C-alpha cells in the first residue's frame, strides 16, 4: 500500500498559481481520505513563470523524489509543455539513472517525455492520470471510473485489469470555484472497438500523447526539442519497440487531421508500426475528429494485419484508467478487457 506521495511539477507550474488553489485544496483533502502522506517537492508550487525559467529546478525535484527513501509514489501535478528541457539536467553525468529507485511514477500528456526518460533508464511507469486533472476533479468526488484505478494503484501498487467505462464526460471549459460540486456532463460510451486486425494480442504497453511524439520529430513548436531528443536517444529504437503495444492518445489541442497524419507518418518512418504487436488508441476529447482519425490510422499504418483498438478511456478524455508500462498486457476486445501479468 502506498504511504507517501511526492507531487512534482515537471511541465507547467499550474499547481502553484492562485487560480488553481481551490483545486489543490480539493485534491489534498481527497488524498488525506486515502490515509496517505503528501508532500509537494520544493519547486512544485513555485508557479508557471518560475518553472518555465528554471527547468533545472523541475529536474532537481524529480531527482530528489527518487532519492528520498520515504517516497513510495511520484505523482505529476499536471502535464503542460516543455518537460523535454529537463533532459540535460537528468541525463548529463547519468544523474537520472543513478537516482532512480523502484517507485511508482504516474502522469500523462507532456509527461510522455518523462515516461520515455524513465523507460530509457529501465523503470516501469504508469500512464493515464495526474493530480490536478483527476484527484482535484471539481465535481462532488473523483469520477468513479477514474477513482477505481487510482484507488487500486494506491492499495496494491499495480493495475491488474482494465475494462471500458460505461460513460464518457464532456471536457470542462470552466475550472473556477463556481464549478465546485458540479459534475461534468456524461454520455453513454461504446467500449473498446476493434478497427482492424486480431481481437487478441499481447506485449508490453509503451507510448503516450501523440502530440508530444510529434514534437520529438518536428521543431515547429520547440525548435530545439528534436535535436535534444536525438542527442539523448530519447525516442525508443525500432528494436526497442519490437513486440510491444503502442499507446497513442490526443491532447486538448484536438490535433488537426493533417497534423495527425504527419505524426503517424513520423512514427511509421521510425519503424514503430513494423515492430509493435498492436496499437491502442485513446478516446479523443469530446469525440472530436474520431472518424477522420480512424481513417488516417488505417491509411498510414497500411497493414490490415496489425491490430488497432480504439476508444480506450485513457489520455485527455475523461474518465481515465491507468495503464502500466513495462509489464506484459493481454488485450481481448471480445472480452472487453486488458489484463496485466
Protein language model regions, located:
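ATP/NTP phosphate-donor binding region
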Residues: 1-70
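Charged helix-capping and loop-helix junction motifs
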Residues: 21-24, 55-59, 92, 260-266, ...
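Long, hydrophobic/aromatic-enriched structural stretches that serve as scaffold segments
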Residues: 67-91
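Structural motif
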Residues: 73-75, 106, 245-249, 280
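Short, acidic/small-residue loops that bind anionic groups at enzyme active sites
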Residues: 92-133, 307-308
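Conserved anion/nucleotide-ligand pocket segment
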Residues: 124-211
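Oxyanion-binding "anion nests"
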Residues: 205-250, 255-256
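ATP/nucleoside-binding phosphotransfer catalytic cores, i.e., glycine-rich phosphate-binding loops
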Residues: 259, 265-268, 278-341
Amino acid at each position: 500500500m502506498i504511504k507517501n506521495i511526492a507531487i512534482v511539477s515537471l511541465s507547467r507550474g499550474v499547481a502553484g498559481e492562485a487560480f488553481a488553489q481551490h483545486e489543490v485544496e480539493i485534491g489534498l483533502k481527497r488524498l488525506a481520505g486515502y490515509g496517505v502522506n503528501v508532500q509537494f517537492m520544493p519547486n512544485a508550487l513555485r508557479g508557471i513563470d518560475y518553472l518555465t525559467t528554471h527547468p533545472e529546478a523541475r529536474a532537481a525535484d524529480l531527482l530528489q523524489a527518487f532519492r528520498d527513501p520515504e517516497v513510495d509514489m511520484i505523482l505529476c501535478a499536471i502535464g503542460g509543455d516543455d518537460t523535454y528541457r529537463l533532459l540535460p539536467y537528468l541525463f548529463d553525468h547519468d544523474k537520472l539513472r543513478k537516482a532512480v529507485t523502484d517507485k511508482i511514477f504516474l502522469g500523462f500528456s507532456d509527461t510522455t517525455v518523462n515516461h520515455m526518460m524513465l523507460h530509457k533508464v529501465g523503470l516501469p511507469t504508469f500512464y493515464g492520470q495526474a493530480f490536478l486533472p483527476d484527484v482535484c476533479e471539481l465535481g462532488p468526488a473523483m469520477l468513479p471510473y477514474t477513482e477505481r484505478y487510482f484507488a487500486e494503484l494506491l492499495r496494491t501498487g499495480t493495475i491488474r485489469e482494465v475494462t471500458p467505462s460505461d460513460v464518457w464526460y464532456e471536457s470542462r471549459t470552466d475550472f473556477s470555484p463556481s464549478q465546485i460540486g458540479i459534475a461534468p456532463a456524461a454520455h453513454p460510451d461504446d467500449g473498446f472497438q476493434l478497427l482492424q486486425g486480431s481481437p487478441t494480442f499481447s506485449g508490453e504497453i509503451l507510448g503516450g500523447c501523440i502530440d508530444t511524439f510529434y514534437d520529438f520529430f518536428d521543431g515547429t513548436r520547440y525548435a530545439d526539442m528534436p535535436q535534444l531528443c536525438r542527442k539523448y536517444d530519447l525516442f525508443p529504437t525500432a528494436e526497442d519497440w519490437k513486440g510491444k503495444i503502442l499507446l497513442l492518445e490526443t491532447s486538448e489541442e484536438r490535433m488537426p487531421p493533417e497534423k495527425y497524419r504527419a505524426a503517424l507518418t513520423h512514427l511509421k518512418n521510425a519503424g514503430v508500426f513494423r515492430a509493435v504487436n498492436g496499437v491502442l488508441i485513446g478516446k479523443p476529447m469530446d469525440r472530436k475528429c474520431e472518424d477522420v482519425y480512424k481513417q488516417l490510422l488505417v491509411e498510414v499504418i497500411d497493414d490490415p494485419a496489425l491490430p488497432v483498438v480504439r476508444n480506450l478511456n485513457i489520455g485527455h478524455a475523461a474518465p481515465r484508467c491507468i495503464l502500466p508500462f513495462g509489464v506484459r498486457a493481454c488485450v481481448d476486445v471480445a472480452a472487453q478487457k486488458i489484463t496485466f501479468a
